[in-house]
Amino acid sequence: MKIGITCYPTYGGSGVVATELGKALAERGHQVHFISYALPSRLDGFLGNIIYHEVEMSTYPLFEFPLYTPALASKMVEVAKFEKLDILHVHYAVPHAISAYLAKQIIGNKLKIITTLHGTDITLVGLEPSFLHMMKFIIEKSDGVTAVSRFLRDKTITNFQIEKEIEVIYNFINPEKYQRRENLELRKSIAPDNEKIVIHTSNFRTVKRVPDVIRIFNEIRKKIKAKLILIGDGPERSACEMLCRELGICADVKFLGKQSDIVPLLSVSDLFLIPSQSESFGLSALEAMACEIPVISSSVGGLPELQVHGETGYIAEIGDIDRMAKYSIELLTNLTKHTIFSEAARN
């Protein structure tokens, strides 16, 4: 098949899943065309049947805001016509599904549109009053719709009164890539005195509650020797660095920024924290679990569908720093329980 894929090309979960899906389809012999404003971050290496098409943006001074939606639709038309695409698979309804629908109307052929809902396009952006009618229309007009969790499917149906069937297809990872590979040298460089290593990865947006991660770690640190690794970057990083200085824990916290390969860092870590305000699935938690790391998470969105409280980690209410810290200390000080949870997380 000839498949077009549009996603946000960033380090977020939706872009990662879309890119890994495209690579896997290409390995199975399909021709895959990525259509976006930048090269997806995970699209590394060369595959002969993967082609990237960059969306060209107009800089005409009359327009106060970039016209990405029509520019994307125009590029979709171009690629679909000349590459004879069978399917356009768009990740995020806003604005990608809108552009795909416009492209299909322009082409007027049997091009199929599959829309995958990932979260904030439904739970935040889509609930803006000015978007409500458009969101319902574009979901109903897609030839197929998937959501990354039951939580997101149900919320979409309720919020927009959707009658169309939405299939739940959970996010995924390659278990052969995401598996624990012990690296004593790397671990010693991070924790020279054999401290426990706590890790968090995110885009440092408000919804991820990274300051909670730091406060939980501060409580852990009062009881046991530990180090915190923070992977990623975003608007709250500076505030988080300031919080570390205020708490006097900078020596034990490492801000590593964006990393192209996080498996080595996951492989030396003992605990993963994800205290998010909202999380439609939680791909970063799945990556950690595949590397045999117990997870401490908030009880939001799709996270309770991903991990089992008391088996693969623990779940607490949003903002309950004391309870998350208590659970963390329990796992980090009980080797037998930690081993059982680690094995369950992988399996």
Predicted feature descriptions by range:
Residues 178-192:
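A short helix/loop element that forms part of the nucleotide-sugar donor recognition site in Leloir-type
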